């Protein structure tokens, strides 16, 4: 008979499956509470690492349409429900599993595709979204930077060929503009004096 607590737990796990773009099933036998807390911190806010009951998880997975965990729910089980960057979360999990042999990555899924443990490790080996975006930005920025260098080189070449008169004329033009501004400023000051006579 389903108790309200179990129904609520199934609903929560089902919701976690539906809201996640990826999930990784782990066995955490032998990890301390402090180690689990450390793992949760390393996963960040976009990943929920939850210790779950196998029978309730099987029901929730079926309700959510997740088949990746069929036959894998045995032993002390925890699931990383990933709502953000799946690569970064998979990397955090695999790094933690390397440092703490008690955490065993069993299986997972990413965007609806079932992953075995080696595929989760392969996902972790990919570059993070931020690094990929930085590379794209660099590729997009490179032509503009190259064009700026070419234009600057052409400007320098023209200045060398013309003996740099363009650079010498610019200060002279500024001086004549300053002289005109000073003359304009002095003229109104003298005009009222002339009216008094």
From Swiss-Prot:
GO molecular function, one term: large ribosomal subunit rRNA binding
Region of interest called Disordered, as start-end residue ranges on this chain: 163-197
GO terms classed as biological process: translation
Family matches, as Gene3D superfamilies: 3.30.70.1730
CDD domains per record: Ribosomal_L10 (cd05797)
Keywords: Ribonucleoprotein, Ribosomal protein, RNA-binding, rRNA-binding
GO cellular component: large ribosomal subunit
Taxonomic superkingdom: Bacteria
One matching Pfam family: Ribosomal_L10
Record note on quaternary structure: Part of the ribosomal stalk of the 50S ribosomal subunit. The N-terminus interacts with L11 and the large rRNA to form the base of the stalk. The C-terminus forms an elongated spine to which L12 dimers bind in a sequential fashion forming a multimeric L10(L12)X complex.
Family per similarity comment: Belongs to the universal ribosomal protein uL10 family.
HAMAP family: Ribosomal_uL10
Entry-linked PANTHER family: 39S RIBOSOMAL PROTEIN L10, MITOCHONDRIAL
Function noted in UniProt: Forms part of the ribosomal stalk, playing a central role in the interaction of the ribosome with GTP-bound translation factors.
Protein's recorded name: Large ribosomal subunit protein uL10
Species the sequence originates in: Pseudarthrobacter chlorophenolicus (strain ATCC 700700 / DSM 12829 / CIP 107037 / JCM 12360 / KCTC 9906 / NCIMB 13794 / A6)
Organism ancestry: Bacteria, Bacillati, Actinomycetota, Actinomycetes, Micrococcales
Gene designation per UniProt: rplJ
């Amino acid at each position: 008979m389903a108790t309200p607590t179990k129904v609520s737990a199934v609903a929560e796990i089902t919701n976690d499956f539906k809201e996640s773009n990826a999930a990784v099933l782990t066995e955490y036998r032998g990890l301390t509470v402090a180690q689990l807390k450390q793992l949760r911190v390393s996963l960040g806010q976009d990943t929920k690492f939850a210790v779950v009951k196998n029978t309730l998880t099987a029901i929730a997975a079926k309700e959510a349409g997740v088949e990746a965990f069929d036959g894998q729910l045995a032993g002390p089980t925890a699931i990383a429900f990933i709502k953000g960057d799946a690569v970064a979360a998979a990397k955090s999990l695999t790094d933690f599993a390397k440092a703490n042999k008690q955490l065993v990555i069993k299986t997972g899924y990413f965007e609806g595709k079932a992953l075995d443990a080696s595929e989760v490790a392969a996902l972790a080996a990919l570059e993070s979204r931020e690094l990929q975006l930085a590379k794209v930005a660099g590729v997009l920025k490179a032509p503009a930077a190259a064009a700026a260098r070419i234009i600057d080189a052409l400007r320098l070449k023209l200045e060398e060929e013309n003996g740099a008169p363009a650079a010498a004329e610019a200060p002279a033009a500024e001086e004549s503009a300053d002289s005109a501004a000073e003359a304009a400023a002095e003229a109104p000051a003298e005009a009222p004096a002339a009216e008094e006579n």
